[in-house]
């Protein structure tokens, strides 16, 4: 299962956020390194399309697709050199597919900040710099192994060296690998498992009071300006403390409480989970029947047989054709039989690619 790692400096709200995401009470304390071993949790990816299909079909069971989050203990400056148990933390980050940077965007004198000041840009740069330094070491080591072969004329080593040399130069100028190479070259670098080649999301941990008017949070404004300058998506505003309190409620209870607080439009964790799911390259297709309506995750670019293999390996091996219909057409017509009458149910073969939001009757 693909996963996202939650990283950040100590005491920015990482573990509180993780607790809310998974509704799992992990160790939370107001001091650095309260979390040493990474905690992992599986979350549902809420999809309104699936819920609408379920309301139409009324199955015995509704199953959302899932996604894995990992809470990785707090990094500090010097982690790439092993400071603050940094080697262990960096090793944990290597195991995830997406990095969620949590930065603090609220003032609270009761909660000690590791740098004694609230500066989300500075916090973000510290973490990224540690990841860059770790990548420099990996690339340097690899270049050292292939340079002699490349200079002697070995074609494969020469091509790899020509790819790595500018990457190393860019890293030394504090640029992330993500912004140094195209998608084709990024795949060639996959075996090195470079940290700054992973997709990045930034989570701005704000106070509950800020949620009603985020434009008036100077820390968030500063952070988003910085991210825009560096071709990174805007931060996702989340109040980790509020989310932790809401996590014990069902969807209706959550919405009622937010409405009472005047925060009906607040998406918070749902936005984070959906954005992470998409950023990691995952899409969904749906299966439906009276017993179950279910969402299935698949990687962008997959063909129909690979998607079928998510349901059962036999389906992938024996795949020939499948009847599909788009979810919105099925929902609008309220009936699979009516959709067939109108010729909207299509028979597709092995060449069907990226079956996003297609529905398959089981």
UniProtKB/Swiss-Prot annotation:
One Pfam family named in its UniProt record: MMR_HSR1
Domain OBG-type G: 2-258
Binding site for Mg(2+): 15, 35
UniProt: ATP binding residues: 11-16
Keyword entries, A-Z: ATP-binding, Magnesium, Metal-binding, Nucleotide-binding
InterPro entries recorded: ATPase_YchF/OLA1, Beta-grasp_dom_sf, G_OBG, GTP-bd, P-loop_NTPase, TGS, TGS-like, TGS-like_dom_sf
Cellular component GO terms held in the UniProt record: cytoplasm
All residue ranges annotated as the TGS domain in the record: 281-347
Gene3D superfamilies for the chain: 3.10.20.30, P-loop containing nucleotide triphosphate hydrolases, TGS-like domain
GO molecular function, one term: ATP hydrolysis activity
Cofactors named for this entry: Mg(2+)
Family statement drawn from the similarity comment of this UniProt entry: Belongs to the TRAFAC class OBG-HflX-like GTPase superfamily. OBG GTPase family. YchF/OLA1 subfamily.
Job description of the protein: ATPase that binds to both the 70S ribosome and the 50S ribosomal subunit in a nucleotide-independent manner.
UniProt xrefs under HAMAP family: YchF_OLA1_ATPase
PANTHER family: OBG GTPASE FAMILY, OBG-TYPE G DOMAIN-CONTAINING PROTEIN
Name of the protein in its database record: Ribosome-binding ATPase YchF
Species of provenance: Mycoplasma pneumoniae (strain ATCC 29342 / M129 / Subtype 1)
């Amino acid at each position: 299962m693909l996963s996202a790692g939650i990283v950040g400096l100590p005491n920015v709200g990482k573990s509180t956020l993780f607790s809310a995401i998974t509704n799992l009470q992990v160790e939370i304390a107001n001091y650095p390194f309260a979390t040493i071993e990474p905690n992992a949790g599986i979350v549902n990816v809420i999809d309104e399309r699936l819920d609408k299909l379920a309301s139409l079909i009324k199955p015995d069971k509704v199953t959302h697709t899932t996604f894995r989050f990992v809470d990785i203990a707090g990094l500090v400056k010097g982690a790439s050199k092993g400071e603050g148990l940094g080697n262990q933390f960096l090793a944990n980050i290597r195991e995830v597919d997406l990095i969620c940077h949590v930065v603090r965007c609220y003032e609270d004198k009761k909660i000690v900040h590791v740098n004694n000041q609230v500066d989300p840009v500075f916090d973000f740069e510290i973490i990224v710099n540690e990841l860059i330094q770790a990548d420099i070491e990996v690339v340097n080591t690899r270049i050292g192994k292939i340079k002699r072969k490349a200079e002697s004329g070995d074609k494969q080593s020469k091509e790899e060296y020509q790819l790595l040399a500018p990457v190393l130069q860019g890293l030394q100028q504090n640029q992330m690998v993500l912004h140094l190479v195209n998608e084709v070259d990024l795949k060639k670098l996959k075996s090195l498992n470079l940290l700054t080649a992973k997709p990045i999301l930034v989570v701005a941990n704000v106070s509950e009071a800020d949620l009603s008017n985020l434009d008036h949070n100077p820390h968030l404004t500063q952070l988003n300006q910085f991210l825009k300058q560096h071709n990174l998506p805007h931060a996702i505003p989340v109040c980790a403390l509020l989310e932790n309190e809401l996590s014990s409620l069902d969807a209706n209870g959550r919405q009622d409480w937010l409405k009472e607080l005047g925060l009906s439009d607040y998406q918070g964790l749902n936005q984070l989970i959906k954005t992470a799911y998409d950023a990691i390259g995952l899409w969904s297709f749906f299966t439906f029947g009276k017993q179950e309506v279910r969402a299935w995750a698949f990687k962008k670019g997959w063909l129909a047989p690979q998607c079928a293999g998510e349901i059962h390996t036999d389906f992938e091996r024996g795949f020939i054709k499948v009847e599909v219909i788009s979810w919105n057409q099925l929902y609008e017509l309220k009936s699979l039989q009516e959709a067939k009458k109108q010729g909207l149910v299509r028979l597709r073969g092995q060449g069907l690619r990226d079956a996003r939001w297609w529905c398959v009757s089981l």
